[in-house]
A protein has these predicted regions:
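Glycine/proline-rich active-site loop of Rossmann-fold NAD(P)-dependent oxidoreductases
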Residues: 156-159, 171-195, 236-248, 271
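NAD(P)H-binding glycine-rich loop region in Rossmannoid oxidoreductase-like domains
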Residues: 40-42, 50-88
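Mid/C-terminal beta-alpha module of Rossmann-like enzyme folds, strongest
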Residues: 221, 229-281, 287
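Amphipathic terminal alpha-helices
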Residues: 302-326
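Catalytic helix-loop patch of NAD(P)-dependent Rossmann-fold dehydrogenases
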Residues: 121-161
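Conserved C-terminal active-site "lid" loop/helix of NAD(P)H-dependent oxidoreductases
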Residues: 227, 277-297, 318-320
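N-terminal Rossmann NAD(P)H-binding glycine-rich loop of SDR-like oxidoreductase domains
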Residues: 3-26
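Conserved Rossmann-fold NAD(P)-dependent oxidoreductase catalytic core, especially the SDR/UDP-sugar
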Residues: 92-137
Length: 326
């Protein structure tokens, strides 16, 4: 088994490679990492190919002799690059894989942006049968296009693939920084822009916890997944017979309720909180299908996600750095 990993230097790619190479189920597996802006050090069972996924020659070289692809390469809100990576790059991957005699399975890690994330109201849990609904911008559109391209290869060529649709992927101290009123905030929303500079400075100083409210004034429920839980699902899907041509929501059992986060942090750390009005809506991704067909179970709930993030201490050689906008 030889697995090509695109986006190998990201949080999911590095975690996947680390766990695969130490997994007793995959002692015979080797990894080829396709790297572009950043790279990895080669080691036993890990080789590196450099180049852009938008270049068919690079993709052909990367796919040669591989049995599986774990496709993680993506773009955020970068219109100048997103179609080269999402459409052209994935198209070249799919074309090379379908024409390879030894190829077995293509794993795509998609995103809940394809379902509108928390932008649109979802009156019932979001399952894998719900229609796509991208919100404004190129990133959400790219998530829809990825899923549709893979689905159509099933129809056109009886292609063996699987899509694992993930919400916001957390590791280390990500969640803590997603709650920051400062310029160091991770992702969105940017709380400082919602409350104003003066209040934001005060909240940042006091480590105040934002409670995101929907238009009706209720705390928003938002979906997350820890990188370790997502990687566990990838490791299952690579060989699982019931994963062929299937789409799975890979997320926590329940979305994170911002009101409950505030209560938890008040109880465990004595942190104050403040309500923040937004236009965002609660969404509940349903992960029942992955549990039923793959036997997958998430190990992170709200308390563990929050506690590990707030407890996390970075070493000097692991500075916090954001590699993409959004």
């Amino acid at each position: 088994m030889k697995i090509l990993v695109t986006g190998a230097t990201g949080k999911v790619g590095q975690c996947f490679i680390r766990r695969l190479l130490s997994d007793q189920r995959y002692t015979q597996a080797t990894v080829r990492a396709l790297c572009h802006n950043r790279t990895l050090e080669e080691q036993d069972r890990l080789e590196v190919v450099r180049g852009s996924i938008a270049d068919r020659k690079v993709v052909a070289m990367a796919v040669e002799d591989v049995t599986h692809v774990v496709h993680l390469a993506t773009c955020k809100e970068t219109p100048e690059e997103v179609m080269d990576v999402t459409v052209k790059g994935m198209f070249w991957l799919l074309e090379e894989c379908r024409q390879s005699k030894g190829f077995e399975r293509f794993i795509l890690v998609g995103g809940d942006a394809a379902m509108g994330h928390f932008v649109y109201p979802h009156p019932i849990p979001v399952t894998e049968t719900q229609k796509h609904s991208a919100y404004e911008g190129c990133y959400a559109l790219s998530k829809v296009l990825e899923e549709v391209m893979l689905e159509q290869y099933y129809v056109q060529y009886d292609f063996d693939g699987c899509c694992l649709r993930a919400p916001w992927i957390m590791e280390k101290d990500d969640f803590k920084y997603s709650m920051s009123f400062g310029e160091d905030v991770f992702g969105g929303p940017r709380w400082s822009e919602l409350v104003g500079a003066e209040d934001a400075q005060k909240h940042q100083k006091n480590s105040t916890v934002p409670i995101m409210l929907d238009p009706q004034g209720k705390p928003v429920q938002r979906n997350f997944v820890h990188v370790e839980d997502l990687v566990a699902a990838i490791l299952l899907a690579i060989q699982h017979p019931k994963a062929k041509q299937e789409l799975f929501n890979i997320c926590m059992d329940e979305p994170v309720d911002y009101g409950n986060v505030a209560k938890h942090l008040l109880k465990t750390r004595g942190l104050p909180s403040v309500s923040v009005d937004t236009s965002f809506r609660s969404t509940w991704l349903d992960n029942t299908k992955a549990k039923f067909l793959l036997g997958w179970r998430p190990q992170y709930d709200m308390a563990r996600l929050v506690d590990e993030s707030y407890d996390y201490k970075r070493s000097e050689d692991d500075p916090r750095k954001i590699w993409y906008p959004g």
